[in-house]
A protein has these predicted regions:
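Short mixed-charge
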Residues: 1-2, 350-358
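Oxyanion-binding/catalytic loops of NTP- or PPi-dependent enzymes
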Residues: 320, 349-350
Length: 364
């Protein structure tokens, strides 16, 4: 009996319903229709043509020509057009697309500090792995031999652990480049674990070699220049994406249509008071929260960040159920984010009755 009163629908049907009920708050035409994928693709192509034509005919086309030269293949601007569309679709999978653009631009305005901090984390991640593997190697040699290898292994560990004490990215790079793996002792020894120890040490050496090849082929001054050049192009590319987005929105408004991405963002806007960083439930969200005893989501692995925030805004305390299998995520082309599912899978408890409970045998 209760099932007959349930709202069973796709996420976009739900978003459409919320948008229509809150059209006045959203400032949209209540008579808008949802465009199909073919119509949407044609409009995007039309807007891109118009935007690029304006840029080619601009009095100051230098920045645009820079993008064409650096993000196309030299024969046409097709690659740049494709890139604009990819970034546009990607940013719409976030609750605040414009905020996402500004965040990316700010990361380049901050220059090398932002990127060096990020690279520092990557380097220390690899070094942590090398340290743990070296500790295992040392323990193996201490217990089962060969003892003649221990001075070299202790030296390996000392060099690797010393990197943790480095304050700056530049210092970390220098210490990694200067790591020296002394030759193992050639003294004859009887040890069943001799080959295992050599194998483990070789794995450590490969980690360091990989770090040098992937991250440290250029010195820090060259990296700073690379970041500066990349920032120049990326910021102008993002400006171009923003222009396309604004023109696309205006054209859809003129035609009184919306696409599926619009439905998600209309719905989210109706459910939020305050900022996207610290969302507060709107009156509409509170009413929906009171309406639904349970909020159940199937194929949860195919959710994106916008959908996740929408569902959280209409859920109450301990009334949300999510079903999915991260291995079956097939909608990456629609910018689903399986990490949302994976994060909950890895943090929810298997303990029955836990506040956030994971049930692995749901289907059985």
């Amino acid at each position: 009996v209760l099932l007959n009163h349930a709202d069973i629908m796709t996420i976009h049907s739900f978003c459409l319903s919320v948008a229509r009920e809150n059209y006045n708050r959203l400032g949209i035409d209540p008579a808008f229709r949802v465009a199909d994928e073919t119509e949407t693709l044609l409009i995007k192509a039309e807007i891109l043509d118009r935007l690029f034509e304006e840029k080619y005919g601009s009095d100051e086309p230098e920045d645009f020509f820079y993008l064409v030269e650096n993000y196309s293949d030299g024969t046409s601007d097709v690659k740049l057009r494709e890139l604009v569309l990819k970034i546009f679709e990607f940013m719409r999978s976030y609750p605040n697309p414009e905020g996402w653009i500004e965040k990316q631009k700010l990361s380049y305005k901050d220059g090398e500090d932002y990127w060096f901090d990020m690279m520092k984390k990557y380097l220390l991640f690899y070094i942590e792995g090398a340290v743990e593997l070296t500790k295992t190697t040392v323990e193996t040699a201490e217990i089962s031999g060969p003892e003649t290898y221990l001075p070299m292994l202790y030296d390996d560990l000392e060099q690797l652990e010393d990197i943790y004490g480095s304050a700056s990215f530049e210092e970390i790079c220098l210490k990694i480049k200067n790591i020296k793996f002394s030759a193992l002792s050639r003294k004859k020894c009887e040890s069943e674990t001799k080959e295992k120890v050599k194998y483990l040490r070789d794995r450590v050496k490969k980690i360091i070699s990989s770090v040098n090849t992937k991250f440290l082929m250029r010195n820090t001054d060259e990296m700073k220049e690379d970041i500066k050049k990349a920032g120049f192009g990326i910021c102008r590319l993002l400006d171009l994406v923003k222009e396309f987005s604004d023109m696309f929105d205006e054209e859809k408004k003129r035609r009184r249509i919306a696409d599926y991405g619009d439905l998600e963002h209309y719905c989210l806007k109706a459910l939020i008071d305050g900022s996207y960083d610290n969302p507060v439930k709107s009156q509409a969200a509170e009413e929906l929260t009171s309406k639904y005893a349970y909020v159940m989501t199937d194929e949860y692995q195919d959710s994106n960040a916008v959908q996740e925030l929408i569902l959280s805004l209409v859920s109450g305390e301990r009334n949300r159920f999510m079903v999915g299998d991260v291995k079956q995520s097939i909608y990456s082309f629609r910018l689903a984010n399986p990490d949302i599912f994976a994060e909950k899978y890895n943090t929810y408890s298997l303990k029955k009755g836990a506040e956030k409970e994971r049930i692995d045998t749901f289907l059985s």
